[in-house]
Amino acid sequence: IQAHPEWLRPGTNRLTASYTIPVVVHVMHTGGAVGTIYNPTDAQILGAINYLNQVFAGTYAGMTPPVEGGAVVNMEVQFAMAQRTPACGATNGIDRVDASALPNYTANGINVNNATGCPELTMKNLARWNTSNYYNIWLVNKIDGADGTSGQFIAGFAYFPGAPSTLDGTVMLATQMVAGEKT
């Protein structure tokens, strides 16, 4: 980057690769109907993915310019809802899973910081598509007992590269999957 600062200027012709990442959103609901607090609608999920794409492209109208100079740039990464399941069936990329049978899930969600709840891997093992082919996003009802509607809470998390594939992906509170939010 230091050798070619001109690459960071908007409108600069540069050699780039553009990446499209197939995404599957696993909605780990507790039996509630689509559109309830822990089971967002398809439109809500698609709106949040569209927002994510706008942020990565540098086109989201709500973005503030960099404080210390520079410019907002297109990261050349796009997230696209998966169109095929691992078995090659058609999909919209949204996988709704009733997770209410998981131990402690309905009352406390997933356990991240040694709180009461379902172990993270137990939840992920219920709904994980091959991490070599898809980016998995799990929408959960609660993390460490908090659902994101009041008080302090963990909105979501992911692991750094190098973590085992069993952990790969993003876990996010269903209440925080909202277009325009900075989660």
Walk through the language-model features, giving the residues of each.
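Propeptide-to-catalytic entry region of secreted or membrane-anchored zinc metalloproteases
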Residues: I1-N133, V140
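Active-site-proximal segment of zinc-dependent metalloprotease catalytic domains
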Residues: V112-T183
